[in-house]
Amino acid sequence: MANKFRYPTGARPLLIEETARRRQTESRFVALLEEAGFAEVVLPIIDFAEPYAGLPGRVEKQSYRFTDREGELVSLRSDFTPMVARALAPSLNGNLPLRVFYRGDVIRCEASRLGANREVFQIGAEIVGDASAEADVAILRLAASMAEVLSENPLIVTSGAPVVDDPRFVEHDEEGDPGYYTGLRFWVYGDDRRTPLAQGGRYDSLYARFGADAPAIGFTFTVN
C-alpha cells in the first residue's frame, strides 16, 4: 500500500497552498521582468540531444536522455540557457540587444547547487547582444529586485562583476569549473544564506555554438 504513494527521489506534487504561493511569486516575478522590458519566450521541455553534446559544464550529465520511437536521441530540459541560445540564434539578424525571459520546469538526473529536487520550476532572464558593463549591472540589479520577493535581506555574491555600490552585493573569487560561463558569475542567496535562490552570469561564447555572434548575460531563479 505504501508504494502507491511514493514518488521518485527529488520529485513531489505541489498541493493547493504551495501552488498558490508559487503562482503568487511567479506573478510578481513576471511583473518585474515586463516592467524592465523583457518579453517572454516559451521553450519545449523535450529536444534533440545532439545540439547540446559536448557543452562545457554539467548539462549532458544532468539530462535525461532516451531514444524516441523514430530512433532519435532526445533529452528532457535540464538547463534553460542553452535552449534559449539554440532557439534565438537563427532569428537574431542584428535585432539586438534583446531582452527575454522564460519560465517552466526543468528535470535533472541529479541534484544541483540550486537544491535537491530533480524537478523544479524556474524563471529566468537574458540580455542578448550587449557586452557592456551597463548590461551586467542591469542584470545584477534585476536579480536583486526579484530576490526581494523571496527574501527580506538578500545577498548577491559576485565573481568578476563590475563595481556595484549596493550593500546587497559582495565580491568573492569563485573557484571550480565555470561551465559555459565566460566572465562574470553570481549567486543570489536568501535570508538563510545556504542554497542559492538563483545563479547567473555572462556566457559570451554560447550563442556562437549555434551560429550567432552574440554576447549574453542572464540568470535563473528556482521557485520551489
Regions found by a protein language model. Give the residues of each.
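Hydrophobic transmembrane signal anchors and adjacent membrane-proximal interface regions, especially
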Residues: S75, I156-T158
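Positively charged, Gly/Ser-enriched RNA/tRNA-binding surfaces
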Residues: E18-A36, D47-E50, T81-G94, V100-N153, ...
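TRNA-binding/sensing appendages of the translation machinery
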Residues: M1-R77, P82, V137
